[in-house]
Swiss-Prot record:
Cross-referenced NCBIfam families: 3mg (TIGR00567), PRK00802.1-3 (NF002003)
Protein name: Putative 3-methyladenine DNA glycosylase
Cross-referenced Pfam families: Pur_DNA_glyco (PF02245)
Keywords in alphabetical order: DNA damage, DNA repair, Hydrolase
GO terms of biological process kind: base-excision repair
InterPro entries found in the cross-reference section: Formyl_transferase-like_C_sf, MPG, MPG_sf
Keyword 4Fe-4S in record: no
Record carries keyword Oxidoreductase: no
Length: 212
């Protein structure tokens, strides 16, 4: 199913930019696969050959070959033999950069997704990269496919166009937060995780809430 809110998938040029420019611009974007759509609330950037936490750090292995380009493609990998995780390839060909779509809110196909997670509350249906991948029913067969359309997975940016400073289109720059990446063992101090403040779907470590 194509996006139905009037926002079209952005072209390859949007993704042919540095990973730290693309990552926060994906916040608020809507990812479609079939009848299910997820609005992205949390992402992580991975810098390829210069990033020891990246799958591409040691070069173009069979698993990570997709990361080397072209940009605007899905990179889907199996985590711990259990969870399929969805990334978008960005940067010039050969830079091997990608953005992990870490968390989001299910905005279409809720009943279908809830059937996949019968014990979870709505905010948790796509909270975390494993659940997001399962909510969208992605598998390794989608790795390397275009996300700019036409294709099985499409990404429609908030507002439908590329980033306009100070933040993603349709998103107030003041809502975007930045901090260390989660769930990795190296380069843990790099502030390459971005999320939308005030979203219950965000999965990574967050500052404690103020007492009411």
């Amino acid at each position: 199913m194509a996006p139905t809110d009037g926002a079209a998938p952005d072209g390859v040029d949007f993704y042919d930019r540095p990973v730290l420019a693309v990552a926060p611009a994906l916040l608020g974007a809507t990812v479609w696969h079939g009848p299910v759509a997820v609005r992205i609330t949390e992402v992580e950037a991975y810098g390829g050959l210069d990033d020891p936490a990246s799958h591409a750090y040691r070069g173009p292995t069979p698993r990570a070959a997709v990361m080397f380009g072209p940009p605007g493609r899905a990179y889907v990998y199996l985590s711990y033999g259990v969870h399929w995780c969805l990334n978008v390839v960005c940067g010039p060909v050969g830079s091997a950069s990608a953005v992990l779509l870490r968390s989001g809110e299910v905005v279409a196909g809720r009943d279908l997704v809830a059937g996949r997670f019968p014990r979870l509350v709505e905010a948790d249906l796509a909270r975390g990269p494993g659940r997001l991948g399962r909510a969208l029913a992605v598998t390794g067969a989608l790795s390397g496919t275009t996300i700019t359309g036409p294709g099985p997975v499409t990404v429609a940016l908030a507002g439908g166009r590329g980033i306009r400073p100070p933040g993603p289109p349709g998103i107030s720059g003041g809502r975007v937060r930045r901090g260390p990446r989660a769930g990795i063992r190296v380069a843990t101090e790099w502030p390459w995780r971005f999320w939308l403040a005030g979203e219950a779907t965000v999965s990574g470590p967050r500052p404690p809430r103020r007492p009411r």
